[in-house]
Amino acid sequence: MRLGTRQTRYEPARRECGRALTESRRLTGPAGDIMLAARSLFERQGVAKTTVKDVAAEAGVTRELVYYYFENKQAVIDAVLDDYVEDLVESVIVWNESRRFGDTPGSLRACIATFRRALYDAEGNPRPMIGVLEELGERDAFDVRAVRETVDCINDNIVAEYAAYHQVEIEFVYEMFCVVIFGLVGLVKINPAISDEALMKVVEQTLHLDMEPLKAPEAGGAEGAGETAKAGDAAGEAPR
């Protein structure tokens, strides 16, 4: 399982197929431990100052084992970037699991809170990954990839569930989600003090979300209702 034989910048952001909401793409085992050690070092002391020897020492392994799993330092960097993307996609998955059927305003509020936590700490400071991305000069490219994979997750797994219970009032659903996520990132950069309520209104108006509460479907209702009940309102996810 040597990881450095792939293209060293980024794998294609669009897969041939999407992922299930239970699927994780994080590295595990020794390769995952090495990647996490590198991530910690990059965030503490910077990428340029971190050597493969440093990564091996942090992970408690030999340099030979690092090179067994990763062709070179660039491959380690790629793995860390992949892990950052996974952070963002998993935050969407966790948010989806926490939603209550019919509580559109509550779901949207939780969505905005998830967005803030993904990028900023409790004091409003950027997460350490932002510094790593800026040092690498990869902020814009990373944003494109992260938005694509996040919207892929939403589009493949959540949009149809919203449409099962709501009238969809927008076209180009996938593209509108890209606009919303890029827009939220830019809006918070311009105005870090903007309230969650204002961000919620931006999402609601842009996606034309139906904010009326819904009652849970009765047991034994339409086929598949049990599977989609929890995610039916899909606030913050996007109608189609």
Where are these regions (language model features)?
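N-terminal intrinsically disordered/low-complexity leader segments
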Residues: 1-29, 216-240
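Helix-turn-helix
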Residues: 29, 33, 37, 41-75, ...
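Amphipathic alpha-helical interaction segments
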Residues: 33, 75, 106, 110, ...
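Hydrophobic alpha-helical connector segments
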Residues: 79, 93-123, 177, 200
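Short, basic, alpha-helical segments at the C-terminal edge of helix-turn-helix-like DNA-binding modules
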Residues: 82-88
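Amphipathic alpha-helical packing segments from all-alpha helical-bundle domains
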Residues: 89-93, 139-167, 171-175, 201
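Amphipathic alpha-helical segments used for helix-helix packing
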Residues: 110, 114-145, 186
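Hydrophobic alpha-helical segments that form the core
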Residues: 168-190, 197-210
